[in-house]
Amino acid sequence: MEMDKEIKRKIIEEYATHSGDTGSPEVQVALLTYRIQNLTEHLKKNPKDVHSRRGLILMVSKRRKLLNYLKEKSPERYQTLIQRLGLRR
């Protein structure tokens, strides 16, 4: 369930807008999406894990806020990110 350093590095490289970019909304949303997918799988196996479910809800909320920010500031970057990640917004 933890994010391996190598996986994190690959996600950052793939979604970075320039070299050394780790804080752009695209990178943050991509990392959150990976964590959300892993936590969703965990919760399918462990449906009574209420504490992890709360963490999942917080991550989804944070991702939604970042996506709303990106949609406001740069709609074209928002659309490409949604398509690349396969999110249904």
Curated annotation (Swiss-Prot):
Recorded GO cellular component terms are: cytosolic small ribosomal subunit
Instruction: Give the Gene Ontology MF terms in alphabetical order.
Output: rRNA binding; structural constituent of ribosome
Could you list this entry's UniProt keywords, alphabetically sorted: Ribonucleoprotein, Ribosomal protein, RNA-binding, rRNA-binding
Q: Name one GO biological process term.
A: translation
Checking InterPro entries in the record gives: Ribosomal_uS15, Ribosomal_uS15_bac-type, uS15_NS1_RNA-bd_sf
One Pfam family name is Ribosomal_S15
Is Glycoprotein found in the keyword set?
Answer: no
- Record carries keyword RNA-binding: yes
Q: What does this protein do?
A: One of the primary rRNA binding proteins, it binds directly to 16S rRNA where it helps nucleate assembly of the platform of the 30S subunit by binding and bridging several RNA helices of the 16S rRNA.
Q: Which family does it belong to?
A: Belongs to the universal ribosomal protein uS15 family.
Q: How does it assemble?
A: Part of the 30S ribosomal subunit. Forms a bridge to the 50S subunit in the 70S ribosome, contacting the 23S rRNA.
* Name this polypeptide is given: Small ribosomal subunit protein uS15
- The species this protein belongs to is Coprothermobacter proteolyticus (strain ATCC 35245 / DSM 5265 / OCM 4 / BT)
